[in-house]
Amino acid sequence: MDPCKFRPSSSFDTKTTTTNAGAPVWNDNEALTVGPRGPILLEDYHLIEKVAHFARERIPERVVHARGASAKGFFECTHDVTDITCADFLRSPGAQTPVIVRFSTVIHERGSPETIRDPRGFAVKFYTREGNWDLLGNNFPVFFIRDGIKFPDVIHAFKPNPRSHVQEYWRVFDFLSHHPESLHTFFFLFDDVGIPTDYRHMDGFGVNTYTFVTRDAKARYVKFHWKPTCGVSCLMDDEATLVGGKNHSHATQDLYDSIAAGNFPEWKLFVQVIDPEEEERFDFDPLDDTKTWPEDEVPLRPVGRLVLNRNVDNFFNENEQLAFGPGLVVPGIYYSDDKMLQCRVFAYADTQRYRLGPNYLMLPVNAPKCAHHNNHYDGAMNFMHRDEEVDYYPSRHAPLRHAPPTPITPRPVVGRRQKATIHKQNDFKQPGERYRSWAPDRQERFIRRFAGELAHPKVSPELRAIWVNYLSQCDESLGVKIANRLNVKPSM
């Protein structure tokens, strides 16, 4: 396949206006009418084409992460990690891989303010020599739920009320009162890190647990961490109101202007590594995306650096049509049995097929830079030039053959088919430890934000009591302080 065989490009622009089919247009100022004041004629093909195309310029926005901005650059491996993965782009220090990165807010629509208290997306597409690898994460290391079957529900709860189209936290607290594992993410959302100053000054995390595989099929669980070299910076509530009131696209503009000025954002990539044979020594499940791995027990290991040194050439082509999916992995990197990750592998690719069409991976920004070949043919908006006679496998008339075997962990999976939750939940320990690590003024800001949302008149007394009980199990003094603000009696 050769995606560059023929590609319409602005580099072929003519000096005069034409129709989409290339015919010259001699007047793009007036419609064709009967006389200077007469009715417009339907035979004015250029007018019809121009208006019809304008009416179809917008495509469905992402159901989540609709508001975002992209930039291009490279990833450089800086440390030898061949003892834990056979991924080619991590083959040796100094190896560089082109990337495109998209930062985003999560819940609100395209064009919404970038100062809203909301998780931020941090998605990286690596154009490796063995295909594209997409690492999708957030600026928080944990998520609200641990099972993908509840993903539509948690997004519905955070999205605006379907009656009023206003985001209301009573809906969030109602739904997540059934999911105490969500507490840990609330201790990031309502913390000072809940509103990053901009995209350049925020951490990134893979959130889910992935698997590194070596050439001899040795598997290890990994979590990914992006650390900005310029440090982490966040907006306080009053600052966010001021910044958002002046410019609702402040983070997008900051990213674009910084790169244009030669102030290239940079992040260091680290991994935490756990041998699956040792996972039972932890008091939590390493495949639970509502948990972090303690760095004193599982230290960060440096891998490489990410540098963004080019702005996108066209926002629509390289941001709106940019499509990520955790199902895109390369040899040496694989999924784990993390229930959220398993669901995301299907969901992200499916939403791209709906949003962009079945051939979304043919779009230049999504297509691999390496040579590739399969028998996926035709479909809506297929623009791949192909001249093969054989579109099946195997065939004695075509040279297509299987690639060399990719190392896959031989670990057996044994169990009964069942719908069940994980055994080691331990939902209150880590949020409590995080709260107690803060200075008193930071604790007070968290209490004010959390209690302020719980004070919504549609949050029932029963619901407030449930959340006070949860918070008390994280930290008894925290529960008492929240209860006093809400006039709720804490219970343990």
Swiss-Prot record:
**EC annotation from Swiss-Prot or TrEMBL:** 1.11.1.6
Temperature dependence comment: Optimum temperature is 30 degrees Celsius.
Q: List the disulfide bonds.
A: none
Q: State the conditions that upregulate or repress this gene.
A: Abundance in leaves follows a photoperiod-dependent circadian rhythm with an oscillating expression pattern peaking late in the light period. Inhibited by water stress. Repressed by abscisic acid (ABA), drought, high salinity (NaCl) and hydrogen peroxide (H(2)O(2)) treatments. Triggered by zinc oxide nanoparticles (ZnO NPs); this induction is reversed by sodium nitroprusside (SNP, a NO donor). Accumulates upon infection by the bacterial blight agent X.oryzae pv. Oryzae (Xoo) strain PXO99.
Q: Where does heme bind?
A: R62, R102, F151, R344, Y348, R355
Localization, UniProt: Cytoplasm; Cell membrane
* Gene Ontology BP term (one): circadian rhythm
Question: How activity varies with pH?
Answer: Optimum pH is 8.
- InterPro entries (UniProt xref): Catalase, Catalase_AS, Catalase_clade1/3, Catalase_core, Catalase_haem_BS, Catalase_immune_responsive, Catalase_sf
* Transmembrane intervals: none
Signal peptide per UniProt = none
Instruction: Alphabetically list the UniProt keywords.
Output: Cell membrane, Cytoplasm, Heme, Hydrogen peroxide, Iron, Membrane, Metal-binding, Oxidoreductase, Peroxidase, Phosphoprotein, Stress response
Q: In which tissues is it expressed?
A: Mostly expressed in young leaves (blades and sheaths) and seeds. Abundant in leaf sheath and moderately expressed in leaf blade and root. Also present at a high levels in panicles, but barely in culms. Observed in stems and anthers.
Q: Which cofactor does it need?
A: heme
Matches recorded under Gene3D superfamilies = Catalase core domain
Composition-biased stretches, type Polar residues, lie in: 8-21
Q: Which top EC class is named for this enzyme in its record?
A: oxidoreductase
Sequence similarity: Belongs to the catalase family.
| Record-linked PANTHER family | CATALASE, CATALASE ISOZYME A
State what protein this is by name.
Catalase isozyme A
Q: Which organism is it from?
A: Oryza sativa subsp. japonica (Rice)
Gene that codes for this? Answer: CATA
